[in-house]
């Protein structure tokens, strides 16, 4: 949902974390008695490209040993900034998941040891943003950190569900 304030700046909230891909942006005027139901978004206003892994990329590993799986397909994936975590539910701490970070080296993602019991888990992704800030003149500069961006160190940072891991 897009909303704006008196200074004409705005934000766009999709309500869900989208997987990598290209999406159509559609508009509804909101001039109906019911507001904007999904079927009312009939006007195509452009394209939105989300960088990240594609959905439904399932993998299998053996419990108790190092796990290496083929790297994930997606748009704009970055060897130096992609992080993967195995969780019971993406973005939710606790439960029986949470195996630390998968390290992407070239065409594989590796976890040192998977000691959880056999079962089905979720492969979750987070992108570590470089410490860059942008200013109004169009330039950029390095910054000591940005509190609004995830640092991909805790389960709640890993919101994008890439697929399932059978262990």
Predicted regions and their residues:
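Intrinsic low-complexity tandem-repeat regions in disordered proteins
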Residues: 14, 45, 120-121, 162
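Extracellular recognition modules
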Residues: 24-28, 122-126
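Beta-strand/beta-sandwich contexts
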Residues: 34-94, 132-167
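Hydrophobic beta-strand core residues of beta-sandwich domains
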Residues: 17, 61-64, 103, 115
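Aromatic sugar-binding surface patches on proteins
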Residues: 1-13, 97-112
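Surface-exposed, short loops/turns at beta-strand junctions within beta-sandwich domains
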Residues: 15-22, 113-120
């Amino acid at each position: 949902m897009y909303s704006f304030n008196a200074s004409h700046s705005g934000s766009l909230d999709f309500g869900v974390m989208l997987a990598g891909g290209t999406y159509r942006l559609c508009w509804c005027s909101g001039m109906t008695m019911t507001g904007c139901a999904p079927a009312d978004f009939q006007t195509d206003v452009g394209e939105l490209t989300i960088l990240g892994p594609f959905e439904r990329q399932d993998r299998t590993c053996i419990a108790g040993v190092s796990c290496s799986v083929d790297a994930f397909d997606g748009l704009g994936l970055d060897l130096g900034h992609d992080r993967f975590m195995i969780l019971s539910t993406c973005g939710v701490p606790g439960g029986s998941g949470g195996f630390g970070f998968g390290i992407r080296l070239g065409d594989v993602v590796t976890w040192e040891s998977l000691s959880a019991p056999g079962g089905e888990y979720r492969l979750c992704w987070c992108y570590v943003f470089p410490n860059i800030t942008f200013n109004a003149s169009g330039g950029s500069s390095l910054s000591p950190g940005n509190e609004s961006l995830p640092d991909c160190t805790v389960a709640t940072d890993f919101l994008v569900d890439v697929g399932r891991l059978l262990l």
